[in-house]
């Protein structure tokens, strides 16, 4: 089965409509007892979770072959839809143990053998699995500069960070450029999409050099004392 969407004037087709919809059903059901998303209706979920996640498909396919991590994954967006569509080995990362337990249930129910989870801080993952990832995604998680610092130690050389954003101020972009030079990351792609009246932006940063400072820094410093 295929699911189609109209976003950029082109019709695109996805092969796994049943799995994508079943994931959303599971999210809405789980959300009745545990707050894993602010989106509670089917219609909003299809647009703001499923279709929004799939906007990142081209960016993920442009990354090198290898493991993919979705950091701050929450209900599994964009990680689960992108794992379903690409078949990449995927790690869903969240610091909230309860959310990760729910994600484990989703993965089992959906039969996703290419997907696993990590409950913990991104900095800890960076220490444990440095340079292990070809691609990382982050959706509405933090400022670009913080995401660059957190993702750089996880990425192998040539690997990419894919940032899902709504509005991005020029100041944030400029600061990210400065921090990128410190952590070995460079902007290589910047796409804007219209999705059901919402403006969405997907920025891809590539790891092009070793960081000039020791990363990851102590847990929490990226947010408390940003570069």
Where in this protein do the model-derived segments appear?
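Conserved SAM/SAH cofactor-binding pocket of Class I
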Residues: 54-140, 148-149
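Short "lid" loop at the C-terminus of a central beta-strand within the Rossmann-like core
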Residues: 123, 166-170, 193
């Amino acid at each position: 089965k295929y699911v189609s969407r109209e976003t950029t004037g082109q019709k695109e087709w996805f092969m796994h409509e049943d799995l994508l919809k079943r994931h959303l059903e599971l999210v809405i059901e789980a959300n009745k007892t545990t707050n894993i998303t602010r989106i509670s209706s089917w219609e909003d979920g299809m647009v703001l979770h499923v279709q929004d996640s799939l906007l990142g498909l081209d960016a993920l396919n442009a990354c090198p072959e290898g493991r993919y991590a979705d950091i701050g994954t929450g209900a599994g967006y964009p990680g689960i839809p992108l794992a379903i569509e690409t078949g990449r080995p995927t790690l869903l990362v969240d610091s909230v143990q309860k959310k990760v337990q729910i994600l484990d249930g989703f993965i089992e129910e959906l039969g996703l053998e290419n997907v696993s989870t990590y409950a913990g801080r991104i900095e800890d993952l960076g220490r444990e699995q440095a340079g292990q990832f070809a691609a990382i995604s982050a959706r509405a998680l933090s400022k670009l500069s913080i995401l660059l610092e957190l993702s750089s130690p996880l990425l192998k050389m040539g690997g990419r960070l894919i940032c899902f954003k709504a509005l991005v101020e020029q100041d944030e972009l400029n600061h990210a450029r400065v921090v990128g030079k410190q952590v070995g990351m460079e902007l290589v792609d910047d796409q804007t999409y219209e999705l059901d009246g919402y403006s969405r932006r997907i920025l891809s940063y590539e790891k092009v050099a070793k960081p000039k400072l020791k990363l990851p820094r102590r847990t929490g410093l990226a947010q408390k004392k940003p570069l």
